[in-house]
Amino acid sequence: MAVLYNTISNMLEQETLEENEEYEALIIDCGGGTTDLCSYRFRIQDRRAAYKIYMETAYENGDTDFGGNNLTYRIMQILKIALVRAKGNQNVSSVKEILEYMDTDIYRFIDSHGVKEFYQYLEQEYQKAEETLPTRFADFERYNRSEYYKVKNNFYTLFNTAEQIKKLFYGKVGALEVTVTSEQKGQRENTVLLDKWKLSFWKGDSLTVEKTVPEVMMNYFEIELLLSGEIYGIVQKFMEELYHSGRIQDFSFIKLTGQSCKIDLFKDALKEFVPGRMIQF
């Protein structure tokens, strides 16, 4: 709600609000693990010294299984596949091959087939990569403790590295290319350092901790393609009913909040349902 008050304050400064006229706003908030959709109806009265704001709120929709962590997980999947390929496992498709498969009319594909099918090939190759670099630590609960913690460490090391990659691409830096390496010497700009002695790979029947890992590179356009399906999927889930019922026309503006909503892909996906001028960050 504080976000909306700030927006109303800005609109008052810009003199774009009329006294006693009713406005409706739609707020999409994408946090780390959940995403919520709320509507607000408000009007203002000028009390000379201050404005009085009358407001009603309603919870419209939500997804407790989608948030910024989902986007990080997708980057982690690609990172894991890239590392496995660099280690010499050619049974797993390359990142380029996977993304070429996904490079279609993404929005229309998801409209027809859904998000799950869009990522089906990626999921298939990610599972193959498990044979070299395991991360499904729940599957190791009945193994010895040493292997369980090695696999758990694999998951969190890759996930935290993926989070750093996401911040470089979508933070203030706005990197176009990111290098992941375990070597400190001769680092390029926009490098994520993956600590040595962190990842364990299968060697025969044993999990072996590797001192270093191969250097891999990722570029912005690959990540945009990778994440566009997830982001359009959640926007479609929230907006489609409002769009087809015509209720979307009742809203004066749509406000995107939360760190993940700063990614332009959210705005691009929303433009499938509303004019771009309605969207605010």
Protein language model annotation of sequence segments:
Residues E19-D36, Y40-R43, G68, G258-S260:
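A short acidic Gly-Thr/Ser loop motif
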Residues M1, L270-F281:
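Conserved phosphate-binding/catalytic loops in two-lobed NTP-binding clefts
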Residues M1-L26:
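Nucleotide/phosphate-binding catalytic cleft detector across ATP-hydrolyzing
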Residues S39-S200:
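Phosphate-binding glycine-rich/basic clefts of nucleotide- and phosphate-handling proteins
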Residues T208-E240:
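Adenine-nucleotide phosphate-binding core of ATP-dependent small-molecule kinases
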